[in-house]
Amino acid sequence: MDNICELFDEILPLIIEYLSDHDKVKFMTTCSRLYYFIDKVYYENIYDYNKIYHLEFTERFKRIRFCAINESIPSVITDLTLDREFTGSLGNCKFPRLTYIKLSQSQYDTNKNYIPSNIEIDIPNPFKNFHLTEFDMSKLFDDSYYIFSGTYMGSSSWYSTKTILRSRNFLSYYWNLDIVNYDRLESPEPESQENFRPIFPTESNNNKPVNKSQPQIKKSRSQKKFDKFYYQKKIVSNNNKRPKSFMKYRR
């Protein structure tokens, strides 16, 4: 019977090693007999030292990470990260199990003589998160009445996203108005002195009879008022002077 128990104690740890770390813990916590093997097997995953330092079998963890801010670094650490505010020197520390270290370029220049050659060194690039965006300044000034917003610059299809904010300066105000060329109004050309409204089929053209064979457009009373307001004659005097009551109608 004793031989069977000894055989059980030798074979069962070998079987447990094929399980994942999560399954190992679940299996060995099912009963007190199996819990005996909890410090007899190895754990493959990487664990934080601050969460397992109270255990008596920390040497059973194959990978243990630690972030150091001073020289007090445990000897069981395998993955070491030096904090930005790390003070001290690695020359006073011993790392029998260290396989990986992460530090800045300045920290590496200070402690490179104390790092063994068989250790993997990770030095992050501080400029890897920066990127340059090139753009044509001429496109920016093409539409000066727009404000550069987000990813849109100008009215052209330079970017797909068209986020437009109108400028509140005086240029945008006068740009959006229908500006009248008063110089031309003061000395109008002969062909521009008379502006006639369009002639509809229901109306007479120079007192000529309307051809009733053509289809006539029936308009409502509101539509007739609309046409009367927007298509009335604009009277411009012939004395080359702008009338006082001049007004430009627009839709």
From Swiss-Prot:
Basic residues biased stretches: 241-251
Region ranges (Disordered): 188-251
InterPro entries: F-box_dom
Pfam families: F-box
Ranges of compositional bias, category Polar residues: 202-217
Domain F-box: residue ranges: 1-46
UniProt name for this protein: Putative F-box protein L166
